Each structure stands twice: as C-alpha cells, then as structure tokens.
Curated annotation (Swiss-Prot):
This is Protein RecA. Belongs to the RecA family. ATP binds at residues 68-75. It comes from Chloroflexus aurantiacus (strain ATCC 29366 / DSM 635 / J-10-fl). Can catalyze the hydrolysis of ATP in the presence of single-stranded DNA, the ATP-dependent uptake of single-stranded DNA by duplex DNA, and the ATP-dependent hybridization of homologous single-stranded DNAs. It interacts with LexA causing its activation and leading to its autocatalytic cleavage.
C-alpha cells in the first residue's frame, strides 16, 4: 500500500526534527544509506581464516573476541590483524593489560612497531577508558585488548589479597561494552578482545570451559574465534611451531561455524606460504603428484617445506596464487572452510 501524502509530510517533519535534535544522520531510510551497508573487512593474515569468516577478514566497526587455551596463538593472530591493517595505511593500538607485549616477536609478525600505539594500563577501568577515547577519536583502525582476564577492577587492586569481589569484572565489562558499542560502530574501528579460558567447577554434562569477564562480551561480539593448537610442528627433534585450528563460533556478518587451519612458526608467526600451499592444493590450483608440487605445468618443488621456501623467495608468484585462491574460494567458502558441529550445551557457546 502506497504511503499517503499526509503520512509522507508527517514523516518528513518528524525525521527533520530528529535530525535537528540528535544530529544529521540520526535516522534515515536504508536506501539512502546503501553505501554504509557494505561491510568492510581487515584481513587476518591467514587466507584460510579470511575465507572462513566469509567477508575476507574481521569486520570494521565491530567487536571481535579471540579466545583459547594458553599458547594457542591468540596474540599472534591479533598481531597479524594489526600488521594487515597497517599495510592498508591504518593506525593501530595495543592495550597490553597483561604487561607481556613482545615488540621483537610483533615485528616478526609484520607489525610496524614504530607506528604502533602501545598502552600498559594499571587497572581495568583505565584500559577501557583509554580504549573508549581511542575509539571516539575516529582515527584508529584496530584496537587490541590483551587480555580480558587481566582487566582487573581498581577496587580489587586497592583491596587486600584474598578479598572476595564476585562479579566485579563482569560488571565492569558490561558497563564498558554498553558505552563502547555505539561508538565502535560509528568509528569503523575493529576492537579485538583477547580472552582466556577457565574451568567451571562441578559441570557433569557438556564442556566445563568458559571465558572470563561474564556474559556481556559474548552478546556484544559480532565475531567470536576459538583458536586451539592441534599439532606441534617439528624439524627433526626441534619444535619450530604449531598447527592451529580456528573455529568461527559466532558470526553476525556471514554464516558461522566454519573452521580454518594454518601453521604458526616460532620465528615468523602465521605461515602465509604454508597456508597458500594447503588451500591451493585443496582447490586444485596447485597440483600434487607424489612429493612434487606443480602450478599448471611448472614444477614448484619437492616436499611442502621446500615449496614453502620457494614461494617465500618468489613473492610475485605467491601473490598471483593467492589472487587465484581468493577469486575461487570467496565465492564458495564451504569448499575449504567446512561448517563444524557445536554442541548446544557447550558452555563456550552459551549466549
């Protein structure tokens, strides 16, 4: 049914009044905001994870949570997202609540340390206030908070050791996210919370694992990534890295429950070349015959490690293979990022 002229006039007057009171753009027709509907993304540094996320990376203007066990690659993944944002000309900040930031390793992951903003706050309130100020500046592309578990409320720091303060951190996170969510959306900043796992006591059925900081972050996060180490990579008897699996537990911008696997090497972070070999082989772009790998009729090398070194020394060829993978995989991500089954009673997935 077409809107009547009287209704059209009343609606226009009301919208004009709202704009005058709350600012231009406070209300608009979706057709007028079509340019804002497209979701921009920042790559993660792993092409497999970019494809699993469905939009080519983590979404701008959203909250992202990365959680998993210790030494699973949470901070490494966050640092690669920072590196990718910097390559796009972005400004990034790292709020180091754990006071454990390693600039040498971050540089190996591709982070431009000279341009990275780093803060090591004393309390959880200070960390979240700094985050809010950076978001409202509209000048930051990525903010990483490492980690939620280290956001200790001021009252707990000023109190005596052993004082019981139940729920204080959860209340702090809930209040902060209520204030931050709108500002994050308007600023197009990606705010990444790194989180740790804890065990629930007395759980008889389902997973006893849960994340710290209460329930608020689970609701406000548009993307939640569960990262786990599945294998230790060795060269002879020496451990040189880890094979990790990332499950997209929640995704508000694309279909969720997909997963990706990639290598994290001790001296360079996420192995881009290893990722390209794995996915290129799955898609048939790279052909494997015995121990040899081929691109079309051209021989790349014998053995995965030799091919990885060859691609590392030939960045133009690596870029071309990556372009072919993205053109094929992003149109059909389920080919290499299959959906995974998540239990309804798993504590991590509760919302």
């Amino acid at each position: 049914m077409a809107i009547t002229p009287e209704k059209e006039k009343a609606l226009a007057a009301t919208m004009a009044q709202i704009d005058r009171k709350f600012g231009k753009g406070s209300i608009m027709k979706m057709g007028e905001a079509s340019s804002r509907l497209a979701i921009e993304a920042i790559p993660t540094g792993s092409i497999a994870l970019d494809i699993a996320l469905g939009i080519g990376g983590v979404p701008r203007g959203r909250v992202v949570e990365i959680f998993g066990p210790e030494s699973s690659g949470k901070t490494t993944l966050a640092q690669h997202i920072i590196a990718e944002a910097q390559k796009m000309g972005g400004v990034c900040a790292f709020i180091d609540a754990e006071h454990a930031f390693d600039p040498v390793y971050a540089a190996r992951c591709g982070v431009n340390i000279d341009d990275l903003l780093v803060s090591q706050p004393d309390t959880g309130e200070q960390a979240l206030e700094i985050c809010e100020m950076l978001v409202r500046s509209n000048a930051i592309d990525v903010i990483v908070i490492d980690s939620v578990a280290a956001l200790v409320p001021r009252a707990e720091i000023e109190g005596e050791m052993g004082d019981s303060m139940p729920g204080m951190q959860a209340r702090l996170m809930s209040q902060a996210l209520r204030k931050l969510s709108g500002a994050i959306s308007k600023s197009r900043t990606v705010v990444i919370f790194i989180n740790q796992l804890r065990m629930k006591i007395g759980v008889m059925f389902g997973s006893p694992e849960t994340t710290t900081g209460g329930q608020a972050l689970k609701f406000y996060a548009s993307v939640r990534l569960d990262i786990r180490r599945v294998e230790t990579l060795k060269q002879g008897q020496e451990a040189i890295g880890s094979r990790v699996r990332v499950k997209v537990i929640k995704n508000k911008v694309a279909p969720p429950f997909r997963q990706a696997e990639f290598d994290i090497l001790a001296n360079e972070g996420i192995s881009r070349e290893g990722n390209i070999i794995d996915i290129g082989t799955e898609l048939g772009i790279i052909r494997k015959s015995g121990a040899w790998f081929y691109l079309g009729e051209d021989r790349l090398g014998q053995g995965r490690e030799n091919v990885r070194e060859f691609l590392k020394n030939n960045p133009a060829l690596t870029d071309e293979i990556e372009r072919l993978i993205k053109a094929q995989a992003l149109t059909n991500p389920t080919v290499i990022a299959p959906s995974v089954d998540v239990g309804d009673d798993d504590a991590i997935f509760e919302e």
